């Protein structure tokens, strides 16, 4: 018996090293620039194994009795890569380079549907500007960023050199700006203060063109632009930055500090900028509307604190302070902004969630002469808002219902004796996201808004469908929009510098818009050859009918009021246009993009010296982004934008193009050096009209940012 056992164990011992032999496979996962991708998932279909790449992009695994194996690598924002690797090669020889997928980069979007949805699955066209793209533009605020990235969008000046937006034929009061889904209080010349929208702690910007009032209510007539805050995933992060620009000796400095302990997540950001007045023309120029760009300084402070008491519940508190001075020749204008809010997000169970929030925003303006407040230009707008949003998932479908209540308070020097006015608005809305087939998605929504001051209500709806018919994705939608009359438009009584009186009209009706949109999209990859990479091409056409537009008309006077201008509703404008966008990036770091917008307006157009839409506009970029070695990364790009001459009977600026060169270098651990030459061709308008590019010619800037936490990795 003992001899038999010995023989059995001997045979097992001889077989063990044979059957137990396994081949070790090693590799490295890199992005298109050569930077390692941490957390990429490597799947081995034959064995069912899955491993993830480490901090340097490295991975290893064992498979018995094989010297070659097929793997599939997946990583958020990149095209899945299936390839064969060998065990007799080292990690460097088994390097796998991932290609960005333009349809999924920063793929989760919320603005178009108010629920998380991948970009490729959103039935409403959404443009996403990622954190990397924001960093490459070196933009200080949303105005700088959008000017470079979006064709058909232009910033100019209105009276008193206040910033004025025109986007696809719509003014600033018809485009809704949000920060994490919350509105901003205050306006000047019908535009929010874009300096409040700094980008120091912004993770991405989502842009939805066309009416979106069925989800967002008033002002979402021409589109929605939503700035979404970063949420740090590292235990701690500290970044410091400073930039100098020669025009106006401009300095911009800031910092961002984040902590993440799992349950607690905090993000604090501070940005301060100062600039001197920039002379555009000499004292003998009598034709230009703008002779100088006023200097000043700006401070932005923001805090966002998140707490997860359980895996299913998240509580968020936020606060912010804004201060800006604009230095004029004989006075200074001061601007203050205060914001705060609380939000709770509860995943009740896997099939339903609830979100409740409160938001407060305040915007004040005042005028100072010799450092003393004159009190003749005092302004304060305060908004309190309550939100509720409930989503129920029904298999692949989703039902969303929500309600909002907002109290709007305004006191301004444009009212009689600086009196105050207020109104309360309330709304309810419902949306159904229907996915009957793998290639078909339909979304329908309806909303009713009520406004107490004008005793008006507005019902809006949206219907959108997406068809995935390979290789094309087709999107089509109808959406209604409205803009309620503001407190200023209803109750204004203002002497405009002795030129004329302007009167409000309490009987104004809400503006209405009807938007129709069709878009075709094609995405894909070139897998082999010199130009291996990914591409995205989309073409869209749209039609907007904008009715009951609120504007001013001549007022003959009355027994108690002198003649002047009064706010009124009038027949609107028809806007037809098309957008074309193409993006391409190779596996070796070369990228190119081109965007074009065509715009045609008809009907009762406002031929204003401040708002003059241009029929043709385009933006383009050619860049190279490469991790050349472990301690050096290079980004170089040349970009530009073009605007045709506006169709106007008034004196206006002509067609122009502006070019920009950007060089960014990442050295060692967390040291980034930026150098920019703006207006590369040194373009200067002969006459600076209100809508001319306010450029002094070619300028340059240099900046440094330090990611302190990377020093210790």
Summary of predicted features, one role per range:
Residues 295, 308, 432, 479, ...:
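Conserved C-terminal beta-signal and adjacent last beta-strands/turns
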Residues 30-32, 40-45, 74-79, 88-135, ...:
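Short, acidic, small-residue-rich periplasmic hinge/interaction motif at the N-terminus
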Residues 60-62, 182-209:
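Short acidic/polar hinge/loop motifs at secondary-structure boundaries
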Residues 226, 234-236, 243, 256-335:
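Periplasmic-side early beta-strands and strand-to-turn transitions of outer-membrane beta-barrels
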Residues 62, 126, 143-182:
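Extracytoplasmic beta-strand/coil segments of soluble accessory domains associated
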Residues 435-442, 536, 542-546, 566-646:
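Gram-negative outer-membrane beta-barrel transporters
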Residues 92-97, 142-146, 161-166, 178, ...:
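N-terminal periplasmic accessory domains that precede
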Residues 264, 355-367, 407, 468-469, ...:
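Membrane-embedded beta-barrel scaffold of Gram-negative outer-membrane proteins
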């Amino acid at each position: 018996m003992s001899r038999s056992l010995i023989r059995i164990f001997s045979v097992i011992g001889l077989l063990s090293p044979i059957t137990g032999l396994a081949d070790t496979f090693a590799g490295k996962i890199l992005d298109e620039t050569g930077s390692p991708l941490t957390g990429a998932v490597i799947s081995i279909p034959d064995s069912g194994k899955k491993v993830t790449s480490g901090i340097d992009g490295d991975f290893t695994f064992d498979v018995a009795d094989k010297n070659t194996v097929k793997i599939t690598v997946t990583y958020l924002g990149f095209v899945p890569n299936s390839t064969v690797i060998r065990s007799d090669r080292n990690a460097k020889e088994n390097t796998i380079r991932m290609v960005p997928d333009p349809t999924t980069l920063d793929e989760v979007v919320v603005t178009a549907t108010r629920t998380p949805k991948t970009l490729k699955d959103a039935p409403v066209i959404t443009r996403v500007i990622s954190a990397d793209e924001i960093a490459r533009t070196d933009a200080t605020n949303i105005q700088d960023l959008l000017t470079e990235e979006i064709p058909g969008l232009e910033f100019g000046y209105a009276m008193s050199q206040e910033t004025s937006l025109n986007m696809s034929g719509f003014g600033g009061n018809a485009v809704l700006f949000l920060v994490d889904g919350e509105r901003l209080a205050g306006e000047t010349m019908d535009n929010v203060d874009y300096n409040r929208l700094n980008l120091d702690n912004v993770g991405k910007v989502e842009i939805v063109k066309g009416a979106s009032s069925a989800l967002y209510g008033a002002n979402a007539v021409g589109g929605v632009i939503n700035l979404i805050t970063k949420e740090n995933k590292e235990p701690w992060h500290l970044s410091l930055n400073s930039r100098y620009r020669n025009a106006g000796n401009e300095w911009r400095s800031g910092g961002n500090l984040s902590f993440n302990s799992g349950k607690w997540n905090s993000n604090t950001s501070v940005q301060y900028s100062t600039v001197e007045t920039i002379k555009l023309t000499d004292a003998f120029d009598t034709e230009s509307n703008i002779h100088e760009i006023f200097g000043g300084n700006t401070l932005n402070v923001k805090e966002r604190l998140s707490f997860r008491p359980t895996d299913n519940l998240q509580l968020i508190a936020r606060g912010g302070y804004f201060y800006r001075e604009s230095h004029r020749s004989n006075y200074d204008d001061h601007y203050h902004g205060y914001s705060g809010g609380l939000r709770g997000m509860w995943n009740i169970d896997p099939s339903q969630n609830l979100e409740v929030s409160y938001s407060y925003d305040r915007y004040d303006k005042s005028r100072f002469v010799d450092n003393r407040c004159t009190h003749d230009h005092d302004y304060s707008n305060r908004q309190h808002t309550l939100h509720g949003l409930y989503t129920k998932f029904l298999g692949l479908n989703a039902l969303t219902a929500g309600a909002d209540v907002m109290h709007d308070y305004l006191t301004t020097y444009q009212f009689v004796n600086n009196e105050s006015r207020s109104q309360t608005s309330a709304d309810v809305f419902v949306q159904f996201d229907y996915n009957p087939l793998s290639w078909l998605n339909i979304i329908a929504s309806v909303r009713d808004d009520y406004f107490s001051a004008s005793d008006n209500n507005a019902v809006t709806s949206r219907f959108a469908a997406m068809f995935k018919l390979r290789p094309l994705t087709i999107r089509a939608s109808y959406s209604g929009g409205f803009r309620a009359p503001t407190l200023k438009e209803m109750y204004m009584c203002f002497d405009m510098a002795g030129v004329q009186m302007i009167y409000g009209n309490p009987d104004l009706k809400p503006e209405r818009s009807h938007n129709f949109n069709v878009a075709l999209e094609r995405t894909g990859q070139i897998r082999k050859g010199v130009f291996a990479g990914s591409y995205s091409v989309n073409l869209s056409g749209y039609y907007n009918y904008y009715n009951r537009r609120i504007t001013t008309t001549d007022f003959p006077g009355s027994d108690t009021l002198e003649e002047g201008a009064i706010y009124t509703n009038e027949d609107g404008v028809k806007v037809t246009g098309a957008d074309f966008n193409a993006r391409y990036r190779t596996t070796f770091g070369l990228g190119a993009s081109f965007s074009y917008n065509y715009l045609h307006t008809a009907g009762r157009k406002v031929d204003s010296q401040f708002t003059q839409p241009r029929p043709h506009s385009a933006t383009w970029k050619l860049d190279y982004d490469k991790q050349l070695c472990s301690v050096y990364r290079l980004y170089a790009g040349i970009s530009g934008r073009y605007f045709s001459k506006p169709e106007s009977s008034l004196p206006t600026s002509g067609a122009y193009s502006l070019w920009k060169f950007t060089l960014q270098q990442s050295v060692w651990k967390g040291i980034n050096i930026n150098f920019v030459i703006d207006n590369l061709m040194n373009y200067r308008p002969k006459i600076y009209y209100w809508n001319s590019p306010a450029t002094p010619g070619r300028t340059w800037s240099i900046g440094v940012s330090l990611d302190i936490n990377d020093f210790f990795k």
